[in-house]
Amino acid sequence: LDRLGGSFFIKEMTMNKKSYSILAVAIAGSMSLAACGGGSSDDKGSSSEGGGKGGTLYYLSKRPAEHLDPQRMYIGRDLADMGRLTYRSLVQMPVTEDAAKADKPVADLATDTGKMSDGGKKWSFTLKDGVKWQDGKDITCEDLKYGLSRSFATDVITGGPNYALGFLDVPQKDGLPVYNGPYKKAGQADFDKAVACDGKTITYKFNKAWPDFNLAAASLRAFDPYRKDQDKGDKSNYAVFSNGPYKLQGTWQKGKGGTFVRNENYDAKTDGVRKALPDKIVFQEGLTNEVINQRLIADSGNDKNAVTDRAVPPSMYGQVTGKIADRSTNPQSPYVDYLVPNFKKMTNPKVRQALLAATSQDAWIKAGGGDKAYTNAYSIINPALTTAYAKNPAFKYGTGGNIEEAKKLLKEAGQPNPSIKFTYSGGTPTSQKQAAALKDTWEKAGFKVTLNELTDTYYDVIQNPNADGDIFWGGWGADWPSASTVIPALFDSRINLTAKSNGQDYGNYKSDEVNKMIDEAAKATSVDAAGEIYKKIDKKLGEDVAYIPLESQKFYLLRGSNVTNYIDNPATSMYPDLGSVGVKK
């Protein structure tokens, strides 16, 4: 998941003749691990007073939902929200603040968390009895199969994750699956062999080990059921057909929002995850960050019952004191911001090493709002990914940088004053201050720096292999709690670098050694075993200065005084967990 300046942007999966390149989601005030709680910033952020059923909860946001179709959703906030309200999965991430539990899936529509066999190349799940759609009809194994089949119709069902296209044991021709989804007839028999139903049991067969498949199924909506008679192709984008505790009342209006009310055919006895406390949840889109947070600070009328995904702007930090601070939360997010040298231009390894030495995380963080906005980062892998995270020893110059060492390295490189251009996502006073802070530290080391601020669009620009820049800014968060959704997506040159795009490998980095280790990690039959390999890969990336970590983002969120049961749950990317939250009546 890409992170981009306070809002999410979908990056559709692109397929080339060789592979699938995951152009995941951009993140904002945030994909997919982290935000919210109660009390002051030194508590756990939970607010558990009250907690009974009833009342109306309001969700205030700026960014409109781009997709509510489960197979097209790929934004952390929306995946979390709809997974709690309308879309149930075979397995689901739990409602908890305990990080040790938040990354372990629990049964939802299925009777358990799945049975893995054949070294991780086969998974089976059995549906519970009594799980129904909003019209009272039973959810069937065929509904699960049909839902996944839609992901293969990449000309119709766009924007969502396409992991299934690369993992399912469906034959390929010219690098692409022979199956093209349910709207065409080609390859149906091949898909039927890879995804098979036997009564209430569904079995998935993969072409390689996928030991954390149940994590993917719990974190993404791509594997959720979808009823064939409700499918209108790309016209289903905002047509929510629920099997969860809530259903959409009327229609969803992009840019304005919609209202969810209780689903009378939902049986809470079949659901051990969601509390489903409010009677009604009203989403209001199109509000600015400043307006949202000013309303939450004022705490009047319906805003007393409101939550948000929009962080408090640094200019308002001084207003969040006393009882207002008691309604704030400041948890760690799943997102890491970083820099990538352009290997097409910055070819001298000593110059890249000098750039690393001259980079001050501390200056960047201070310019961006300080410790309420960020914490220092020591790897591109977020600490929440406990099986793969370790402080990268290659980043040895401290969070404040080492100007004298940088000068020494530039002298050794024979380039004491190299000219560099920093391309970054801008358009806000904060981003401009942060870029200026880096420029200052780099120039102290001897670099001659030009700032290249992009305001209207960003990732599609830097994904051009010939993009203008020596250094690019980037931000990323895991699709589910596994480094397999971080390292390969960003640094496997085989799935990223083509004549027309560098995918997420914005710096055009290419290493046969790294690619070989990525293959070794993919063959691992456990998440722990793969994690040890990813630690070695990360060390190699650091030694090559394939990236420079800047910080790990934090969320600074307010809520209304009537909101109850508010928790900071890594499983919902630290956005308000709608499976827990309620309102005082």
Q: Where are the regions that the model predicts?
A:
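Periplasmic-binding protein-like
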Residues: D69, T329, K344-T386, Q434, ...
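Surface-exposed binding/hinge segments that line
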Residues: T126, K145, R150-Y226
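Extracytoplasmic/peripheral linker and loop segments enriched in polar/acidic and small residues
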Residues: K193-V195, L451-Y459, P488-S561, K585
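Extracellular/periplasmic solute-recognition and catalytic clefts
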Residues: Q249-V261, V282-K344, A367
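Structural transition elements
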Residues: K372-E412, G427-K433
